[in-house]
Regions:
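Phosphate- and divalent-cation-binding pockets in alpha/beta enzyme and binding domains
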Residues: 184, 208-212, 281
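Active-site-proximal loop/helix segments of hydrolase catalytic cores
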Residues: 188, 243-306
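Active-site neighborhood of phospho(di)ester-bond hydrolases with catalytic His/Asp-centered motifs
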Residues: 140-142, 171-181, 201-203, 222, ...
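Conserved catalytic scaffold of divalent metal-dependent phosphoesterases
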Residues: 137, 144-148, 223-228, 233-244, ...
Length: 306
């Protein structure tokens, strides 16, 4: 009985310690600038008018029902805590890690980058970051230049620097964002453009993050799926994706919209997928806006947990 009593006391103490640690973590991270801002006021009102918004749950949803619920069911930590503590992309000791830099071509951007006439010039900078010149305008897709894709610098670290540093970039006319995950929306990169004339094209809700980081709202255009704006001779259409969003794990998931993008001029057309699982929206995008001369499609991020 005495032994059981000691065990019970240790369990209570351990539970209390874990609770205090959890509260401390919440208090710490609630003040983290990296988290951005959850849409409120007029921003939230615009969200509620979207056909992709679920008013009962106050979140955005995918066209395919139950996709996120299925993902969360597979990724539940407590289903197998011993396995899931190490079998994830944050703390998995078996994750293959390159011991040499991957092959790349580094060099100065051409002086005639903007002289595209009826063509598209582009440079892949790593992961989802693409620099493109379309219709004599420079466009940067999902710019990420930080050393890690997380709110803290010691996890999700990149294996090698981007092919071009942020300081080497030419003047950028437009930055196009697909969603607010850290490997696609980089706070430090966004802040780099605070004093520039760059305009931002983002899915619904993401403008709240940018404003929180010092970007004036008159430089940001928010889109719902299938909305189109013609700017500087380029037709920008925000197109669907099958994914999710959030910068605070499960605390504020799906509070901003995720998307892909279709760009078209009189001479050419480009598709940028962002992150997306395979679903019927790919065919619909092709039927409605294709064919495309050039596509940028993220691949390889599949896992049984998502």
């Amino acid at each position: 009985m005495a032994t059981r009593g000691k065990v019970a006391r240790w369990v209570r103490r351990g539970s209390t310690l874990l609770l205090l640690m959890a509260i401390g973590a919440v208090l710490l991270f609630s003040q983290c600038e990296q988290f951005g801002a959850v849409p409120s006021g007029p921003d939230h009102q615009r969200m509620t008018e979207s056909p992709n918004y679920n008013p009962e749950k106050d979140i955005f949803v995918n066209e395919t029902p139950g996709v996120i619920d299925e993902m969360l069911a597979h990724s539940g930590f407590w289903a197998n805590p011993r396995k899931n503590l190490t079998n994830n992309f944050l703390f998995n000791p078996n994750t293959p890690t390159p011991n040499v830099l991957l092959p790349e071509v580094r060099g100065q951007l051409p002086s005639d980058l903007r002289d595209t006439s009826d063509t598209v010039k582009f440079t892949w900078l790593g992961h989802a970051t693409v620099l493109a010149s379309i219709n004599e305008k420079t466009i940067l897709f999902d710019p990420v230049f930080s050393e890690s894709a997380a709110p803290v610098s010691w996890v999700v670290k990149r294996y090698q620097p981007p092919a071009i540093s942020i300081d080497e970039l030419p003047s950028i006319d437009f930055i196009v964002i697909s969603h607010d995950h850290y490997d696609h929306l980089d706070m430090k990169a966004i802040k780099f453009f605070r004093e520039s004339g760059t305009r931002f094209l983002v899915p619904l809700g993401v403008a709240s993050h940018l404003e929180h980081w010092g970007i004036s709202r008159d430089r940001v255009i928010e889109f719902d799926w299938w909305q189109t704006r013609d700017i500087a001779g380029i037709s920008f259409t925000c197109t669907p994706a099958q994914h999710f969003s959030g910068r605070t794990a499960t605390i504020a998931m799906q509070k901003t919209l995720w998307s892909s993008w279709a760009l078209r001029t009189e001479a050419t057309s480009v598709y940028f997928s962002g992150d997306s699982g395979y679903a019927g929206h790919f065919k619909e995008i092709g039927d409605r806006l294709g064919p495309f001369d050039l596509t940028f499609i993220d691949a390889g991020q599949y896992n049984e947990r998502w």
